[in-house]
Amino acid sequence: MTAVFPAPAWLVGCGNMAGAMVEGWRAGGIDMSAVTVIRPSGKPVEGVRTITTYPDEKPAFVMLGFKPQKLDEVVAGLAPLVGAGTTLVSMLAGVAAASLRGRFPEAKAIVRIMPNLPVAQVQGVTAIYSADGNQDELHDVRQLMASLGMIAWCETEEELGVIGAVAAAGVAYVARFGEALARSGEALGLRSVQAQMVAEQTLIGTGAFAAATGSHMADIARQVASPKGTTEQGLAVLDAADGLQPLLDRTLDAAIRRGKELAAEAAARD
């Protein structure tokens, strides 16, 4: 089934992640004629009508695509326009569904999403949570997010936060790993540009291999590592007690902890 925006659909704000989603929808051939981007700057969004003030009609679909810190500034003008026929979709990190419900009490449904940057290439992961309906009842949202890649429908907001740390923030962590791999190659004598290209293609190729073969990452590591070979020696460093796993555990813990702090800050403003 082709994803279709309920009409009229508003995208309030269009930051980096919201812009990536628009790029992915357009790349996937989704009809954007029902969508209006509303942003104070009036900065155009390619392929989508962009205005600076809210239209007169009540929206059927609203997606919040600005920074969480601007929520209360936006609510004053937007909340009176969100009615019983409006599905409100939020990508605001750390702002709980209950906080959104308090600010938009008339909304038909409140849906939280956590997309990641590869949605722009229709290769994303989008976590979805709502207490106001299941996947069938919120099929418009499900189809729109599925058109950008993989979706993960969450049973709790805690699960949404964990997937956000693994997938949304995880893009930055994978990119930082690739950067570190390139720097290590450069330190061993590779030219800077060459090291970067090799590291990037290694990440791309590993993902493509996993997708094509259905192999788990652990299986790929075992395939590459010959007994007593060079790869095995390197993996021994990564697998040490103070190696990669505990480092990533601390990394995700820090991200999730910050998400909880943001949620507490938003709740304190309720």
Predicted regions and their residues:
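A short glycine-threonine-serine/GTX helix/turn-capping micro-motif
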Residues: 161-172, 221
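NAD(P)+-binding Rossmann beta1-loop-alpha1 motif at the extreme N-terminus of oxidoreductases
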Residues: 1-52, 61, 123, 186-188
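Internal alpha-helical scaffold of NAD(P)-dependent oxidoreductase catalytic cores
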Residues: 99-109, 125-162, 173-212, 258
